[in-house]
Amino acid sequence: WILLFIGFAIKVPVFPFHTWLPLAHVEAPTAISVILAGILLKLGVYGLLRINYPMLPDAVFWFSGAMALLGLINVIWGAMCALAQTDLKKLVAYSSINHMGYAMLGMASVIAASAMYGGNQAAAQAGLSGAVFQMFNHGTISAMLFILVGVVYDRAHHRDIDGFGGLAKQMPLYSGICMIAFFAGLGLPGFSGFVSEFMCFIGAFPVFK
């Protein structure tokens, strides 16, 4: 189970196997970043749900608390690292680590609250819905953010956040779309990211309280 988990955790990516993702996004062209964030990162969580859990349910159940803790670390660590970035593309990459942490948390709550262990069926349903919805939302939001970063990079030929002062005056429509995309990435109420993250917490709180 541990070897399978490490393999899928690298793909998610889960802390401390996350270090490859920001470097890969920075070097990749926009189209590859969109595919990586929109589709490929989800395969890690999908593999944990579709391969690890059915094959080794007892082991996954016993380690569900550790998986939830790693997901929570992803949420906090990804957000803190994103705040420290000056490269706009690397900021979006670290936000992906944060977003996938919510999916990990929701998935762990599904396993811990599974009915086959006499757990909370409502929490399991909320966690599963939250994890799947979060993966979908991350795919759309992060792909949109990487496209927006690619657009401004083609114009400015750099990604230094400090060099984008006054951009709203030159590109008002672009700035408005950016604001909507980043608000969605933040998970503010009214955007899809809030719903999925809230469902992950609803699934996790009754199980890991």
Q: Where in this protein do the model-derived segments appear?
A:
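Hydrophobic transmembrane alpha-helices and their helix-loop junctions in integral membrane proteins
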Residues: W1-K209
